[in-house]
C-alpha cells in the first residue's frame, strides 16, 4: 500500500470482525528490509471498509489520504493519519495514542479514548453526530468543530480543547482538570461545566453567538481578536473580557434578563450590553450580576433601544457590588439601525 492514486477497499463476508493494520510498511531496494516502524505514505485514493471491518493505525509514520476515508471503526495507536478529502465518514474513532488530522471535512458518530489518549487535529470541519467521551488526549487545530443537535461531546480527566471554533447545537460537557481554549462558541445547544475555565481567544478576527443553555458552573474568559455574543446566562458562571476581546451580552425577546455571578471587564477589553432589538416592542437587555469590576483600560458600552416609549424604564445593569477603577471607560449609544437618537 502507498502508491499515489491507489485506493484500499475491504469487505468482510464472515461472521467475525476483520482487522486491517495500517502501518505504512514500505518495501525498499538494495540491502534494506521492510521498515517495521513505517514510513510516511501518501494515498491519492480512498480507504473504505464494509460492516465489521476495523482499521488500526500502527507504526510511527504518517499516512495521508487524499480521497475519502469511509470506515466503520478506526483505532489510532501510533503515528498519524491526515485526511485531505471532503467527505470522510467514520462510525467510531478510538484515540489510543496516535493522531488524526482532518484537513478537509469529516463526519464522525462516536469518539472514544483510552488511557494513552491521542490527538485529533481539526484544520477543516468535523461534525459529531453521536455520543463521544474522552478522558485523555486533545482536540486541537484552527478548524471548526460542530456538535450536531442531539449529539454530545464530553471531555473529562486530562482531555482538553485547544484552538478550534465550536458550534454546540448538541451538548459540550467539560468536567476535566485541563482548562479549555477555543476560538469561538456558537450554537443553541448546551455548554456544561464543572467549575473549570474555558478561554475564548483568537489570533485573527472571529465571532461566535451562543444562545443555548449554560449548565453547571464555570468561567468564560474572552480575549484576543475574539468577539463573543452570549444570549443566555447562569448565576453560577463568571465572565471576563480582556486584551482585545469583545463580550456582547444580548438578551432575547423571551428572556431579556441575563444572570451571572461575576463579570470582570479587564484592560483593553470591551464589555457590551446590547438591547434585544431595535423594534418599538424590543426590550433593553438587563444584566443582573452579583459582582462586576471595570478595570483600568476597559470599555463598557450600554446600547439602548431608543425606539421604546420608555427606554430608561428598566435598568441595563443591576449588581450587588460594583467596582470602578480609574481609567475605565463607558459609552452610552443607540441601537444600530434605530433612528430615534442617531
Q: Where in this protein do the model-derived segments appear?
A:
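Beta-strand-rich extracellular passenger or scaffold domains
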Residues: 1-342
